[in-house]
Amino acid sequence: PYVELADLENCAGLALGSPTRFGNMAAPLKYFIDGSSAQWLSGALAGKPACVFTSTGSLHGGQESTLLSMMLPLLHHGMLLLGLPYSEPALMTTGSGGSPYGATHWSGIAGDKNISEDTRALAIAKGNSLAATSTPCNGRR
């Protein structure tokens, strides 16, 4: 695997992303998260900041439900979820993705739609927010 459960324990913050699969996170990510019972029991992720992002092949392909499906286990772990506030101007103008729940991208069925400037701005804002929040939390334990 590209990441191991121990990496979650050692991270200062988590950006969790998945393509949408019928309104849910992809099965391999779900399988990975389902294996994190030891971290849940120990509280290893409690208090760490996290955000979620996704992409879909169709405009109404389940972006928000996918983001929510990734948020639920993070909440069970006691992580601090960061959304995208409406103070981000691009959230009001984007036509290709983005939600208060997290950054999204509508890639098109063939994956041929480029990331718009609004989508890029929202992703950068989310990354900046995670970085700024992770730094003060880094020494929490």
Give the ranges of each region predicted by the language model:
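Glycine-rich phosphate/pyrophosphate-binding loop and the adjoining helix
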Residues: 85-141
